[in-house]
């Protein structure tokens, strides 16, 4: 048999207290009577009652004494026992949890296909998935701009450009500088990812240096430092320095404090070490002095910056567009050089040949020449607009112009502007007199090459307005305007051998002398009749357009034969023949006269 373990003291005490708290009950007594005499007394428990009574009394007293002692201890250590019990319970719980985790871990180790997942403690933050980029992770352009900013801030050891400048530091700064900039603001913009390209970062850097050179005088430390930083910064951020891996653009590694200049770089610098050291430890007084080589590099950096800004502006306003200029090649061909190329860092310039194949479409099958066909949408009709129609109808020279009449005006004056100008000039001198009208007509004839007079004659012929042909009108005007017209007519009398019958010229001088007042009325009536006949003839001829086949037309009518067919036989003494139809001057000379000649 195994060894019997004793109960724990606390458990024994609790069981004893439970037993002591129970009230003691007296056993029942049984009295048996046999034949009227008492026999024996049996207790319900089967023990002696006297012995039980003595023992119960003794235990009761002992229990009372222990109870008194326990009350004293409980009053003193009651609060201590509660805390100890709580601590013990917590420690037991922790031990149980550890043992439970260890047992589960050992059981899971035997299962190779099952993954062990251990929950991290609640105070540690939950890690994000590595495949997803973190929110605070910087982009490549941000890393590049942060590197540039660190390099630029190292060139400002005193921190002049580290923070924004206020009016308390520099009086009147806000009145002079409208767009302030500093390294702190640039850093905030880098963190906020407001720079979309290096060009914008360079623009803010140049703005900061320009503000310092604008506010400060050239002999101040701030001006010299700003100019020095501007030159070094643009040189560092130039494309050539980035491609060659210059010492300023290479990422610097931490070096011992004893060495003032970094020696190890990603690539070897083209400059000797002495020149680099002299540049970095150059005194502030000589910061403004630039040699020819450094000045050229500075100008080159500024030109590259301006070119980058222009390229970005073009790409922003015309995305995908190609702007450039024409240049002639060595062999004489034309090339179109593109400025805003898709790859600005490309070594070769983007060019396109300019020839007929690039300007015209392909030759269609069956055609031997490249024809040009203008689209209907490109055709401009001047009469389609309401403004043109109103402006043409409201003129006082020609009212209610028709489409064919407008075509005549356009053929004479060229375009709408020319028509309006001609009509405006004629309307201006409408009531000014014949001399002003003649001056305007001569001016328009000189401009249009004589088309003005021919157009007016055709228009008035269509409207049945009597008017001399332009050639005859000019001849008549020149003869009427000359002061020596009578002498010229008289001088023609000395030429009897001419083919024209000039016998009527001898009677021109006698007309005014021999006319009586009574005969003047008769002459006026005849002149009126002749004018009416002329008007009817012009209306008859002007109403119909001449046909293209003039050779197949019939002979002249009887009326035309009456006016044009009969030769004039004027004598010196016949006065009434002067008032005949003026068309008689257009007839051909008689055959007899020609025979004489």
UniProtKB/Swiss-Prot annotation:
Primary localization: nucleus
Pfam families: Bromodomain (PF00439), DUF3512 (PF12024)
Subcellular location: Nucleus
Name listed for the protein in its UniProt record: Bromodomain-containing protein 9
Quaternary structure annotation from Swiss-Prot or TrEMBL: Binds acetylated histones H3 and H4. Binds butyrylated histone H4. Component of the multiprotein chromatin-remodeling subcomplex SWI/SNF called GBAF, which includes at least BICRA or BICRAL (mutually exclusive), BRD9, SS18, the core BAF subunits, SMARCA2/BRM, SMARCA4/BRG1/BAF190A, ACTL6A/BAF53, SMARCC1/BAF155, and SMARCD1/BAF60A. Interacts (via N-terminal bromodomain) with acetylated RAD54. Interacts (via C-terminus) with RAD51.
Record region (Disordered): 1-25, 38-138, 536-597
Transmembrane segments: none
Histone H4K5ac H4K8ac and histone H4K5bu H4K8bu binding: annotated segments: 214-216
Molecular-function GO terms, alphabetical: lysine-acetylated histone binding; nucleic acid binding
Organism: Homo sapiens
Lineage: Eukaryota, Metazoa, Chordata, Craniata, Vertebrata
Modified residue annotations for Phosphoserine: 56, 566, 588
Signal peptide, first to last residue: none
Keywords, comma-separated and alphabetical: Acetylation, Bromodomain, Chromatin regulator, Isopeptide bond, Nucleus, Phosphoprotein, Transcription, Transcription regulation, Ubl conjugation
Modified residue annotations for N6-acetyllysine: 373
Gene transcribed to yield this protein: BRD9
Swiss-Prot/TrEMBL GO biological process terms: chromatin remodeling; negative regulation of cell differentiation; positive regulation of cell population proliferation; positive regulation of stem cell population maintenance; regulation of transcription by RNA polymerase II
Site positions per UniProt: Histone H4K5ac H4K8ac and histone H4K5bu H4K8bu binding: 169, 222
PANTHER family cross-referenced by the UniProt entry: BROMODOMAIN CONTAINING PROTEIN (PTHR22881), BROMODOMAIN-CONTAINING PROTEIN 9 (PTHR22881:SF4)
Basic and acidic residues biased stretches: 11-25, 50-62, 74-85, 111-126
Residue stretches of biased makeup (Basic residues): 1-10, 63-73, 86-97
